[in-house]
Amino acid sequence: MSANSGVKRASKAFKTCLFCKRSHVVCDKQRPCSRCVKRDIAHLCREDDIAVPNEMPSQHESSPNDNNIQGKYANKAHTGIPSDYQNEPVNKSGSTYGEELSPKLDSSLVNDTTSLLLPQQPVFVSENVGSEFSSLNEFLSMLENPLLTQTSLSSSSASNVHLENGSQTTQSPLEYQNDNRRDEIGVARQENRSPTIMSGSSNSISKGDKQDQEKEESRILANANENSAPTPKEQFFLTAADPSTEMTPEHRLKLVINAKLEAGLLKPYNYAKGYARLQDYMDKYMNQSSKQRILKPLSTIRPAFRTIARSLKDVDLVLVEESFERMLLSYDRVFTSMSMPACLCRRTGEIYRANKEFASLVDCTVDDLRDGKLAIYELMTEESAVNFWEKYGSIAFDKGQKAVLTSCSLRTKDGIRKRPCCFSFTIRRDRYNIPICIVGNFIPLS
């Protein structure tokens, strides 16, 4: 090389060789340079012949080739279509700046330009790459989560609208990957929400099923109660309240007593409680002489009653109570048809039936005169009560006498007023000749 060329190479643009320039190091002025000699490429060491211009050409002074190249790359960068510059022959007539390129630099410059312009674009990539996998993932997610079906349908309908309007846009591979990532994130969020939604819906479904099951069970129980036969106690009340007149009174009495016996309400009466009640009343409201007069006849008849009762079995005592119930039912009809004050009481004095005339006479209700709530001696004066028990004791075991006519003085329930009456009572006996009840009739004297 000439000296003039060495002087020219003293400038900064031609100071280094081609390989030192690529490595961004400063080489010496010897050719081949010491660095290329060490790398065993002394035969390739040469200077870079590309002259660096002082000014870059302006935008308006760019060549038509530059405009074509820039337009091509800009268009392909926006559309996402892979560049086909590698299939086109390289124009060797001029460089980008209007200078000739050596054949050895063509491929390197083209590769450098390609790496700078399209660093992230794959070569020969179709715009539909991965679409089949995306469709498959979307289909599987729809099968696993039915809640996403509506979302996918709405998105597909929106895409159909864009296609019909002719506004189809082309996505680059990078944008396509970002969209797929966003779709996967949305699906993951929806799947995270779906267990809560499904658990809430399952809880509501389980609660609804439980409520329906409870309603069904209550309905079945109600139907069973309606269809089931009444209990023995209910059957007794239904039979006793039946106003049927098609059967004879004897047959009706038999039905009522049998129903009460089956209900367990027909039991032997404990007369010891009745005598204890009488004893308490005498201790509270009677003097000693009156008590002795009452206890004298009772001391005679009570041992006789006790002796007979001990010889009887429980079945016999139940039959005695059955006969008493028969008398109660028969006297209900009798008391309703008569206008004379009357009542029916046990041999211990507890009143079990009475008519409304007797209730008005002693100033109380008919219900107060039922089932032993009041006793006959509690509605009499002290002298009248003593007279009653003496008369009763005298004929209790006398089969030839069963009725007594005498006088008494009744008093109201509150004990304020007195009602003098003509009094007659009749003793009814059972099959064992034991007094079972006392029926009294009263005629007021004033």
Swiss-Prot record:
GO BP, sorted A to Z: cell wall organization; cellular response to xenobiotic stimulus; negative regulation of transcription by RNA polymerase II; positive regulation of gluconeogenesis; positive regulation of transcription by RNA polymerase II
Chain positions with Phosphoserine modification: 102
Residues annotated with Phosphothreonine modification: 231
InterPro entries in the record: PAS-like_dom_sf, PAS_13, Zinc_cluster_trans_reg, Zn2-C6_fun-type_DNA-bd_sf, Zn2Cys6_DnaBD
GO cellular component term, pick one: nucleus
Post-translational modification: Phosphorylated by SNF1 in absence of glucose. The phosphorylation is required for induction of transcription of gluconeogenic genes.
Localization per Swiss-Prot or TrEMBL: Cytoplasm; Nucleus
A molecular-function term among this protein's GO annotations: sequence-specific DNA binding
Biased composition (Polar residues): 56-70, 84-96, 160-177, 193-206
Keyword terms, alphabetized: Cell wall biogenesis/degradation, Cytoplasm, DNA-binding, Metal-binding, Nucleus, Phosphoprotein, Transcription, Transcription regulation, Zinc
Observed phenotype of the null mutant: Sensitivity to ketoconazole.
Segments of this protein annotated with the region Disordered: 52-106, 158-218
Entry annotated with the keyword Manganese: no
Record-annotated membrane-spanning stretches: none
Annotation: DNA-binding region: 15-45
Cell wall biogenesis/degradation recorded as keyword: yes
Biased composition (Basic and acidic residues): 178-192, 207-218
Role noted for this protein: Transcription factor which regulates the expression of genes for gluconeogenesis, the TCA cycle, and glucose metabolism. Involved in the cell wall remodeling process and drug resistance.
Anything else known: Present with 799 molecules/cell in log phase SD medium.
Name used for this protein in its record: Regulator of drug sensitivity 2
Phylogenetic classification of the source organism: Eukaryota, Fungi, Dikarya, Ascomycota, Saccharomycotina
